[in-house]
């Protein structure tokens, strides 16, 4: 997890025009979170789930911030919505540990990302919710949020 230790995932940025600051996830952190969720969603769509609980040691992040799983196996035998829910619960814990390892204080998580983690940890996820998980607003890069906001205001 050297990437997480060398690159802060939770950053403090100024509010333009004021002396105030707020906490947000770096764009690479949101990309990592979305990539890991997309991997799970892809495997679940194929009717497969993780055969063992996901751990921090199962996540590999390259020097450029690309993320993937390592030393994990997926199985179709016994696939159920409960297995899908378990995979996302474990992903939620792994994402929190990644942020902590990068020096981030969980108390400073932005509200949208906190809600995303709550969504992952809920025990009532349905298969249709996977679309909402991988496209959650907390996983959008800041430039996409600005574009949406500006186009909404001016058009």
Locate each region found by the language model.
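Conserved structural core of kinase catalytic domains
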Residues: 1-31
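Short amphipathic alpha-helical interface segments
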Residues: 23-27, 46, 108-112
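Well-ordered, non-membrane alpha-helical segments in soluble/globular domains
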Residues: 26-37, 87-93
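Catalytic-loop of the protein kinase fold
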Residues: 31-62, 66-71
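C-lobe/activation-segment region of protein kinase-like
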Residues: 50, 62-132, 147, 151-155
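Phosphate/adenylate-binding glycine loop and adjacent helical scaffold
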Residues: 137
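Extended catalytic cores and adjacent scaffolds of nucleotide/polyanion-binding enzymes
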Residues: 144
């Amino acid at each position: 997890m050297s990437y997480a230790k060398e690159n802060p995932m939770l950053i403090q940025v100024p509010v333009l025009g004021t002396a105030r600051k707020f906490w947000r996830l770096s764009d690479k952190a949101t990309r990592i979170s979305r990539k890991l969720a997309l991997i799970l969603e892809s495997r679940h769509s194929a009717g497969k789930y993780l055969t063992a609980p996901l751990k921090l040691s199962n996540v590999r992040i390259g020097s450029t911030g690309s993320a993937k799983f390592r030393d994990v196996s997926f199985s179709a035998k016994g696939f159920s919505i409960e297995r899908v829910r378990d995979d996302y619960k474990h992903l939620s814990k792994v994402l929190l540990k990644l942020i902590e390892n990068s020096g981030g204080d969980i108390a400073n998580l932005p509200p949208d990302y906190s809600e995303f983690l709550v969504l992952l940890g809920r025990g009532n996820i349905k298969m249709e919710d996977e679309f909402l998980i991988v496209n959650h607003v907390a996983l959008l890069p800041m430039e996409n949020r600005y574009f949406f906001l500006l186009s909404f205001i001016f058009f």
